[in-house]
A protein has these predicted regions:
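ABC family nucleotide-binding domain
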Residues: 2-204, 209-210
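Conserved beta-strand-loop-alpha-helix hinge in the C-terminal portion
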Residues: 214-231
Length: 231
């Protein structure tokens, strides 16, 4: 099993004031799976992604990725894990305004252990014509594609997407989701995607539903092409 979470707990406060962001959450994913995570705000979705991304630590339980126990590795190993194993895409694009599209991607490539080709990635993401443009010259969808390219250039084993289409219109959302399906197939990248949009769920191999820090549904799904979804 590529990703294993077992009885993971993340809590804030003590005694009667304790709030569980994750409450004994367990999950197993195979390499190359695409997983959509559903749930209301505050349910623990982002906490789960932060744990897998090495951005936060569990109070209890174990998280193992590709045989590596994230709770027992050194700080140096954790930094290398975040740098080389994990790509993260947020709803906000987090681009460097004074750099072109190509330069934004190159910044990440230059600190990565086994990066992909910038030119191939630009072509895969359909933004090769915008390589010399600055972020302010791009549409929202083009900026999100650039953000995805920044996350992918390091050739990560895991891509974590936190509401990546939340700020996009329906057509652009569809384009970005089709792109993620393409990436998943071409690079065998394990993708976990948070969304409030129930209609997106059928695009995934696995559908998780989180409520009050607990995984209350874990459904194996026969994925559908994004073009067939009512987004």
């Amino acid at each position: 099993m590529y990703i294993q979470m077992k009885d993971v707990v993340k809590k804030y406060g003590e005694g009667e004031n304790t709030i569980f962001a994750l409450d004994h959450a367990s999950l197993e994913l195979e390499k190359g799976e695409m997983c959509v995570i559903l749930g209301p705000s505050g349910s623990g979705k982002s906490t789960l992604l932060n744990m897998l991304g090495g951005l936060d630590s569990a109070d209890d339980g174990t998280i193992i990725v590709d045989g590596c126990d994230l709770s027992s590795i050194s700080k140096k190993e954790l930094r290398e894990y975040r740098r080389n194993k994990v790509g993260i895409v947020f709803q906000t694009y987090n681009l460097i305004g004074e750099l072109t599209v190509r330069e934004n991607i190159k910044v990440v490539r230059d600190i990565s252990a086994a990066p992909l080709s910038i030119e191939e990635l630009l072509k895969d993401l359909g933004i090769e014509r915008h390589a010399a443009h600055f972020p302010e010259q791009l549409s929202g969808g083009q900026q999100q594609r650039c953000a995805i390219a920044r996350a992918l250039i390091k050739n990560p084993a895991i891509l974590l997407c936190d509401e990546p289409t939340g700020a996009l219109d329906s057509k652009t959302s569809r384009d970005v989701l089709q792109l993620l399906q393409k990436i998943n197939v071409k690079y065998r990248t394990t993708i976990l995607l948070i969304t409030h949009n129930e209609n997106i769920a059928p695009m995934a191999d696995r559908i998780l539903r989180i409520h009050d820090g607990r995984i209350v549904e874990n459904i194996i799904n026969t994925r559908k092409p994004v073009k067939e979804l009512d987004i």
